[in-house]
Regions:
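Beta/alpha (TIM)-barrel catalytic core signal, keyed to glycine-rich beta->alpha loops juxtaposed to Asp/Glu
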Residues: 8, 98, 129-343
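Glycine-rich phosphate-binding "P-loop"
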Residues: 24-40, 124, 129-141
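A short, structured active-site edge motif that brings together acidic residues
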Residues: 86-100, 124-130, 190-191
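Acidic-and-aromatic substrate-binding clefts and catalytic sites of carbohydrate-active enzymes
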Residues: 31-34, 63-71, 99-104, 133-134, ...
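Short, acidic/polar
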Residues: 37-53, 102-116, 171-173
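Acidic (Asp/Glu)-rich catalytic clusters
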Residues: 14-15, 73-87, 114-120, 177-180, ...
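N-terminal binding-site loop/beta-alpha segment at the start of enzyme catalytic domains
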Residues: 1-90, 217-220, 322-343
Length: 343
């Protein structure tokens, strides 16, 4: 094998002074149409995580829900042993699921993640959602302010270097900031061309809370989108023309645009060439007029709508008029690892 292509990913400084790489590797494999967890891309993803670290990625985004913490832990251990990377060079994020929203359970969840990852601390732990429910899917109505107290506690204990949130709306963030000692460093949300989240980004910027985008391509990739999904697709002529000008792909243009907005992105892929492609966005700059053209694609279209949760307390999104449904079993309780045999 020849010299491996290397990517150089810059960092943003969080409100606690810690550096967080501007682009990370996202490790959520997703659910199948029947609501079960999708293991089909598992082996490819494990290979890609390893490859990503080899070529220069330092930021890995995972969660208890993703089931893959044990494998990530094995990869990290091997890369450190092989001298590819030092622990302090890595930025590892995990998340606490809404079934662990009590003050006692937050620490239980994080310690479980640390055990699976083989680490004594993560760089960031997030409250995955502002809601809370039992493993039977029953609303626990726990105030996220109480949950956040436990996040401040695990921070004090040194189990994590920073604490943040995910899927919180502006009102929830305002209330959290007003009633806590430690401000979240990040809010990780769905954000892409069609769903630009301007109000949320403006508020977070005013508070020095960094926005992190999961689903940075939204519904642009037809195979991953609902048939009636709105917003631009990969073959949009405007996007294709801008990509051609810079000799880049449309995905690179989208990721570059989000980077120029100051947003950290977590593109997910199980294709090695895309691992490199996604991070090869730091060698060119979109002009102001191109930036403005890309901003016009924002039609406030949310592609991820977990309507099965919309009657839970603290559900963060707008509600849709759909028949009531229950939380998929795969999001109530699970075992971890490829063989689903690790607590």
């Amino acid at each position: 094998m020849g010299t491996m292509a290397k990517v150089n990913i810059p960092s943003f400084t969080l409100n606690n002074g810690i550096q967080m790489p501007a682009l990370g590797y996202g490790t959520w494999l997703g659910l199948r149409p029947d609501g079960e967890f999708d293991y089909s891309g598992w082996d490819k993803m494990v290979d890609c995580i390893s490859y990503a670290i080899d070529v220069g990625y330092r930021h890995i985004d995972t969660a208890h829900l993703y089931r893959i913490e044990p494998e990530i832990g094995q990869i990290i251990k091997k890369k450190i042993q092989d001298g590819v990377v030092k622990r302090e060079d890595l930025f590892i994020t995990t998340k606490v699921w809404p079934t662990y929203a009590t003050e006692a359970d937050v620490e239980v969840s994080l310690r479980g993640s640390l055990r699976r990852l083989g680490l004594d601390h993560v760089d960031q732990v997030l409250a995955h959602w502002p809601m809370s429910y039992t493993e039977e899917g029953v609303d626990r109505k726990i105030d996220y302010l109480d949950t956040w107290q436990a996040f401040e506690t695990v921070l004090k204990k040194g189990l994590t270097r920073s604490i943040g949130v995910s899927n919180f709306n502006v009102e929830q963030l305002k209330r959290l900031v007003a009633n806590s000692n430690v401000k979240p460093v990040t809010n990780q949300v769905e954000l892409n061309l069609a769903f630009g989240q301007k109000e949320l980004v403006d508020y977070c910027t005013s508070q020095n809370i960094r926005v992190v985008a999961w689903a940075p391509f939204g519904a642009m990739i037809p195979s991953r989108a609902a048939p009636d999904a709105k917003g631009p697709k990969m073959d949009d002529p405007t996007l294709v023309a801008i990509a051609k000008k810079y000799n880049k792909s449309v995905t690179q243009i989208v990721l570059r645009y989000l980077y120029q907005r100051g947003i950290i992105t977590l593109p997910k892929t199980v294709t090695p060439s895309r691992v490199i492609e996604n991070a090869s966005i730091f060698d060119f700059e979109l002009s102001q007029s191109e930036f403005d053209i890309l901003a016009k694609f924002d039609i406030k279209y949310r592609s991820n709508r977990p309507t099965y949760w919309q009657n839970l307390s603290n559900y963060p999104f707008e509600k849709y008029d759909v028949p009531p449904s229950t939380t998929p079993k795969s999001m109530l309780s699970w075992k971890n690892g490829k063989n689903q045999d690790i607590d």
